[in-house]
Amino acid sequence: MAPRSRTCWMAVAALGALIVLALVAVACGSDSSSTTSAATDPVRPSVTVSLPTPSTTVNQATAVQLAMSDLTRLAPAASQTDLLSAAASMQAFGVDLYRVLKNTTGDKNLVFSPSSIVTALAMTYAGAGGSTAQEMAATLHFHLEGDALHQAFNSLDAALESVNFEQKDPEGHQVGVLIKTANSLWGQRDLAFEKLFLDTLAADYGAGIRLVDCKTAAEKARQAINAWVADQTDDKIPELVPQGALDSLTRLVLVNAIYLHATWMAQFDPGSTKDGAFTTAAGATVTARMMRQTFSFPYGKGDGWQAVQLPYLGGKVALMVIVPDKGRFAEVESRLALDSPGATGVSAPSTGGLIDQAVASLGEGTEVDLTLPKFQFRTQAGLKDALVALGMKSAFGPEADFSGMTKQESLSISDVIHEAYIAVDEEGTEAAAATAVIMRATGMPAQPLQLIVDRPFIFALRDLETGALLFLGRVTDPTA
């Protein structure tokens, strides 16, 4: 991205918001030279998967030949109930994952994208069977089955992209909201993939197939995947898949990327930004750049915390900031997943604990004198251990059942890699995140209410119409 100027509008939740999920399947069985040429799902006659030869498309930057399927994505058709169920799954899984990650990151800042991670794993789930599918459904809080689940994610993706718009402000600067999502499938060129699996990816996720050769050119395949991720994330995630992550046993990589760029409905005046003290989670005092403005924000409070919601232009997406009282951050943070049933509670979607409490507390608008630090950081994390801890165990072992992907070889997940980036300034937010799953074989007061965010806080970037949790994290040190 070019250096930011007044003519380059900022993205929601930070300088840039992007989430990418990559899944690589690695074979545990024998090799075969058979290829997939065409596949048609009888349930979806409008979708035809046609795989051209690897020479069809060449990535000039990496000299890797990529064959892309000509896939037709179905129009969104899920009911509102199913759409909200998919969004609830993202929130329930997000708070579960937050609980695990916060215990492994210490006092550090944290950001990740439940939306990106769940979408990528939903694509993986399309090829799962037996106990592997059951564990994934429980861990991801899926309460829909079969086509209904994947159609719900298709409709949710369309709902998120429908908020996009761009306009010029009174000074002639471009402002707006941009949420861009993309899915792709990278497969070993001589592996026969099941047609129903490919059709589901095509119809409900818009994911084409790129044929690569990890058996003899794993590094070139890695470079091609990273180039695609970098392009989808405006170069915020330049190298999602690290060296050595792909090898001759790699058979499949599923990638999801989300990029969010949005302008505040009420921008902060840069002239009002001053240095200010911020007490970190470790108890140290650092000097942060503190933005300040008075505006009518949705505001609420509960036991030991206050919440304020900063909407982006259009009013459909917002960043909610939950600010625990001084000395109560750990206590309040522990309530984030208080109501979440975890991997064993599959009877109903989680209520999300603290997030839902904060949302319910928000009034229509309260005049708030808000002081908020600017921040910019990224989180890189391997999610294998976290997913196993949440109940998704068999997917990573030799007993994994991904026979819905291919009958030719036995596949299991070897790792899940996630990277997220977020930046928040006076104009708005931009964020980026990437995940790779690697598979082996109330009333307005007379005076403004003052809220000075000078201590650790939790943030949730949400789509207000569906409740989809796009980004979730915490800021314990805005200068880190």
PLM feature spans:
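Conserved structured core elements
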Residues: 87, 91, 111-115, 130, ...
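Extended hydrophobic
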Residues: 254, 306-322, 446-480
